[in-house]
Amino acid sequence: VGIDLRLWKNFTATAEVYYDHRTNILVANNNVSGILGIDPPKACIGEVKSRGVELSLGWSGQHKDFNYFVNANWALNDSEIVENGQAYQPYDYLYTRGHKVGQLFGLEAVGYFRDEEDIAKSPEQTFSVVRPGDVKYKDQNGDGRIDSEDRIAIGKSTAVPEMVFGLNLGFEYKGFGIDMVFNGVSGLTKQLNVANVHQPLRNGNTNIATWYLKDKIRWTEAMKDVANVPRLSTLSNENNYQTSTQWIEDG
């Protein structure tokens, strides 16, 4: 559904509301039992619902040899995975069905281990041996272990922003003109998995991102009560660098 208006010869406006229900998307059918011992076959069973609203406004004018224009656009998007052939999951929160396209899944970080006593009282850590200052995760299913079955939907989509907006303006005078374009998005989750943020000082990477200079407080014994990033280490530490709420930001 759309509306297109033109007023006063200079002003234009367009509004659109759309709904898209895609079916028969080719995906891997992981519902097939693994007993077969082969890769799951692909089948046209995928289904996605998309909804959105778009609005654009424009103004143009002329005064003698001077021409100018301003165009603005804004869009709000939403999507839902109805079916994607995902295999059976032991817990409902592990299913990607019902979530947005590109929804990120990971562990929920709940702080840092304060000391060895804290580690001993916590659930079993399966990703690596942990030390004080390492990231502590929530045991979502209460089984006393931190593993892949504790991953939940975190943040928002990493692929499709909820909102897109832009501004295009320019002018022309006697054959000379300038156009300017500004674009932006919001409602998107970005993973901080670049080397100088995610794992600095490892594998020959001697740089630490300026991201740490903002409001980041590295865990140390003296700063354990106010720290918001884990201890620094040059050694491998799989626990600290799992996909989790520790390493995401709004995009």
Question: Which residues make up each language-model segment?
Answer:
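A short, polar/proline- and glycine-enriched secondary-structure boundary/capping micro-motif
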Residues: I25, D147, T189-N193
